[in-house]
């Protein structure tokens, strides 16, 4: 079971984020599934449609995102993953002009998998801090020439 869950989570990151497939969200995220902590620490997204709305916003800002999974730990129906997202801020979907900065975001996701779908995801990342730094860079032409990591 845990190897199947591991494979599902690997497919999730590869297809949903790296290949940007909305069909994969419908396939792998349970209808009543909940995603906590994305995009903000106190956010709760319920179901594929809610997740797809945020997914589109995120890809609108970072269309070249690529996530690399690092540690993957499986136990029963839970899969924990540490990951790094590398991307360039190229769009204005976050509500401010693109800075064209290359950025990285480290995170950890703990997912609950049942019957081949993700039913819960708890995400831990510093998205708010990243957006704050990008907003500051957008407001300052000097900072906009520097790379954030």
Ranges and model annotations:
Residues 1-149:
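C-terminal and inter-domain tail/linker signature
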